[in-house]
């Protein structure tokens, strides 16, 4: 199972890799990282989307935002699950995410137990 | 000669007149024979200023005033005479004479008068004495008038001076009030920018704090795992992770600390001293604060942020609080401009704000450039003026750039300039001497 994580903070990679160390080691999970929406788009274009089951995207990123990426992904790869992650858990952002087709919304700091459930429920 | 007045009476009257006092009898007689008399009701003019001076008058009965318009020079009555001056110099009358009550005058014509003068030159002495008296009297009146005018004038000057002094102290009060409101406005502008910052600050602190929490939580779990592990390779792996995590905790802790410091610095009333500051670091931090501030207020907002920092930028002595306000103001404006252009909805537009530092001629340059809406040529002169704003009311105080301008040019002896092309870009250039 391949997950693409998109965030402008570089340290999320170390965080996620440690958090999911066992799963990664066991080969249950493969993680890819992109540090901007544009990066993520090229990753998605390169790897067949069927290779990836889930995109986990930050909203507030310089350049294109997580919403731009969400829109792009849902238009191009409608069956791909996108979960939004943001420090701003207000109703506006949540409604916007769901109306654009996000399959979930996680508020930072991330509850990793919840995230694990989310990932493995797919 | 009038029928109602007897010849003898006229002689008596003339005798009483100072001018003719020493005149021999026959001459008085001669004069009396040529005299005519005339009556004037109260208020009637006997002489008008500017009339030809061809006769002199002796008051037989009644009272007249000698005047120039409303200015009364003298009031004279029975036995006195007037109009002799014009008779002598042949000039037009310099004063008017009007009857105050019913008045009868004897009129001595110019020719008759001169005949008497020819026959009895000694009368000249009387004339001169009389003229001197008249002149003196007139002079006294004029001096008195002048004195009263002078006093009036002095009073007026005194009054005006007092009024001015009052006005002046009023103005001083107004000035004091203005200074106070100016301070309040500056404070308001500070608060407004701080308000805008708050969201950015909250986000900018939350991110590193999340990392601190996440990595420390993670490390605790790793330690538990470590205790149970026996495999050396795995233990070594965990130790490496732990070390990395501690570094991350440390870094993000410092990051949050620096943001809080900046915020405190920004909102403090006044820095006492200049401090050596790393303008690269400040530019970077405030670019991000501004970005998150914008984002928190407009969820649709986003832009590319580019930084081109000179590697060996010298530290500069600045009021760091003031410089941070300038940076924040310029970044906010830049982001506002790109957001405005983005809202026009032109395909393929990539909003971008960049900051570039360099050293030129012993000055540190900070260039803040955006590819937003741009500033029209006609506005370029005005943007540094207080209260100039293009933002809708309520969105800007119009003080940001004017304060920034003062901070750079006055407190730091630097320069703040702008380049812009409408629809292409705007670039603000801060220049601060090292
Ligand atoms: Mg982010």
Give the location of each predicted region:
Chain A
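Acidic catalytic/metal-coordinating carboxylates
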Residues: 36-39, 65-68
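Alpha4 helix (beta4-alpha4-beta5 surface) of REC/receiver domains from two-component response regulators
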Residues: 68, 89-104, 114-117
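Receiver (REC) domain switch/active-site region of two-component response regulators
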Residues: 111, 120
């Amino acid at each position: 199972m391949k997950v693409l994580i998109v965030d402008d903070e570089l340290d999320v990679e170390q965080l996620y890799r440690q958090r999911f160390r066992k799963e990664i080691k066991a080969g249950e999970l493969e993680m890819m990282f992109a540090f901007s929406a544009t990066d993520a788009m090229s990753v998605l274009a390169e790897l067949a989307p069927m290779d990836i089951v889930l995109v986990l995207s930050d909203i507030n990123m310089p350049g294109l935002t997580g919403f731009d990426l969400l829109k792009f992904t849902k238009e191009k790869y409608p069956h791909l699950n996108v979960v939004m992650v943001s420090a701003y858990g207000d109703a506006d952002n949540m409604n916007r995410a769901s109306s654009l087709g996000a399959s979930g919304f996680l508020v930072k700091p991330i509850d990793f137990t919840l995230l694990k459930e989310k990932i493995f429920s797919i | 000669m009038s029928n109602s007045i007897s010849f003898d009476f006229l002689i008596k009257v003339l005798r009483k007149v100072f001018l003719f006092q020493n005149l021999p009898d026959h001459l008085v007689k001669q004069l009396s024979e040529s005299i005519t008399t005339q009556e004037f009701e109260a208020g009637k003019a006997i002489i008008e200023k500017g009339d030809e001076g061809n006769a002199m008058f002796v008051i037989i009965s009644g009272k007249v005033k000698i005047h120039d318009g409303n200015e009364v020079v003298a009031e004279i009555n029975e036995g006195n005479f007037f109009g002799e001056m014009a008779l002598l110099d042949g000039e037009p009358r310099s004063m008017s004479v009007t009857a105050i009550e019913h008045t009868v005058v004897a009129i001595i014509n110019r020719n008759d008068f001169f005949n008497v003068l020819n026959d009895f030159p000694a009368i000249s002495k009387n004339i001169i004495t009389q003229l001197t008296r008249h002149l003196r009297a007139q002079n006294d009146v004029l001096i008195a008038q002048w004195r009263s005018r002078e006093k009036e004038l002095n009073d007026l000057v005194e009054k005006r001076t007092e009024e001015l002094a009052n006005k002046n102290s009023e103005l001083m009060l107004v000035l004091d009030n203005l200074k106070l409101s100016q301070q309040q406005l500056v404070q308001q502008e500070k608060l407004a920018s701080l308000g805008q910052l708050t969201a950015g600050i909250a986000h900018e602190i939350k991110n590193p704090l999340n990392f601190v929490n996440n990595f420390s939580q993670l490390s605790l779990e790793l330690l538990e795992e470590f205790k149970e592990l026996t495999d050396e390779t795995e233990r070594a792996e965990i130790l490496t992770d732990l070390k990395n995590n501690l570094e991350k905790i440390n870094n993000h802790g410092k990051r949050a600390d620096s943001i809080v410091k900046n915020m405190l610095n920004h909102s403090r009333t006044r820095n006492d001293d200049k401090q050596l500051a790393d303008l690269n670091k400040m530019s970077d931090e405030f670019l991000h604060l501004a970005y998150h501030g914008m984002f928190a207020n407009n969820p649709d907002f986003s832009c590319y942020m580019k930084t081109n920092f000179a590697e060996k930028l010298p530290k500069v002595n600045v009021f760091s609080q003031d410089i941070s306000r300038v940076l924040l103001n310029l970044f906010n404006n830049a982001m506002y401009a790109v957001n405005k252009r983005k809202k026009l909805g032109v395909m393929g537009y990539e909003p971008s704000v960049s900051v570039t530092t360099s050293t030129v001629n012993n000055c540190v340059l900070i260039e803040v450039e955006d590819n937003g809406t741009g500033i029209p040529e006609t506005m370029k002169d005005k943007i540094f003026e207080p209260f100039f704003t293009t933002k809708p009311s309520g969105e800007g105080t119009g003080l940001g750039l004017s304060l920034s301008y003062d901070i750079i040019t006055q407190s730091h002896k630097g320069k703040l300039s702008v380049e812009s092309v409408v629809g292409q870009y705007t670039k603000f250039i801060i220049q601060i001497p090292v």
